[in-house]
C-alpha cells in the first residue's frame, strides 16, 4: 500500500459511509416512511407546527407545506403528520375547554410548548382509539421532556394521566399484554 494511501483511506471510508446512509434515507423517503420512529417524528413535526400556529398564526396549508419541505420530514410519516395537524388545528378551542377541566392553570397561561404537547396528547387519547393510551402518554411526555421547560414533562404527564383515566376507563390501569 502506498504511503499516501494511509492518509486518504479514512477520508474515503467516511465519504463512502455517508453516501450509503444518504442512499438509505432516500430509499426510505421514496418508499414512504413507516414504523414507530416515523410516527414519533411525525408527532415531533406536528408539535413544531402547532407551536408555530400559536406564535405566528398563518394558514394551515402554508405551515404544512413548510414542514413537508423540511429535509427532516423524510424520516417522518407525513400522512400521520397531516392527519394530526388537520384534526387538531380546528378543534383547539374544544381541546382547551377539556384542558381547563383537567388542570388548575387556564390554557391561555400555559407555556406554548406544553400547550401544544397537551393538544397533541389529548387528541390522540380522544380520537385514536387504536393507539394504546400508554403510547400516547409516553410520546407526549418525551416531547415535553425534549422541547419543554425543565419540569414541564411532569405537568404534561399528570394532566394526560388524569385525561386517560377519564377518557379510557376500561384500558386505564390494565396490566401490559
For the regions a protein language model found, what residue spans apply to each?
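N-terminal interaction/assembly modules
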Residues: 2-146, 150-177
Amino acid at each position: 500500500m502506498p504511503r499516501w494511501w494511509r492518509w486518504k483511506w479514512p477520508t474515503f471510508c467516511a465519504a463512502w459511509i455517508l453516501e450509503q446512509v444518504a442512499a438509505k434515507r432516500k430509499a426510505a423517503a421514496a418508499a414512504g416512511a413507516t414504523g414507530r420512529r416515523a410516527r414519533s417524528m411525525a408527532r415531533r413535526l406536528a408539535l413544531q407546527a402547532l407551536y408555530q400556529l400559536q406564535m405566528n398564526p398563518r394558514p394551515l396549508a402554508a405551515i404544512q407545506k413548510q414542514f413537508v419541505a423540511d429535509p427532516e420530514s423524510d424520516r417522518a410519516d407525513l400522512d400521520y403528520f397531516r392527519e394530526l395537524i388537520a384534526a387538531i388545528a380546528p378543534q383547539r378551542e374544544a381541546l382547551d375547554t377539556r384542558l381547563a377541566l383537567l388542570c388548575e392553570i387556564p390554557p391561555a397561561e400555559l407555556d406554548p410548548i406544553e400547550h401544544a404537547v397537551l393538544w397533541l396528547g389529548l387528541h390522540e387519547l380522544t380520537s385514536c382509539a387504536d393507539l394504546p393510551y400508554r403510547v400516547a402518554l409516553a410520546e407526549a411526555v418525551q416531547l415535553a421532556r425534549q422541547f419543554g421547560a425543565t419540569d414541564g414533562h411532569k405537568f404534561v404527564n399528570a394532566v394526560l394521566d388524569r385525561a386517560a383515566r377519564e377518557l379510557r376507563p376500561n384500558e386505564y390501569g390494565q396490566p401490559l399484554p
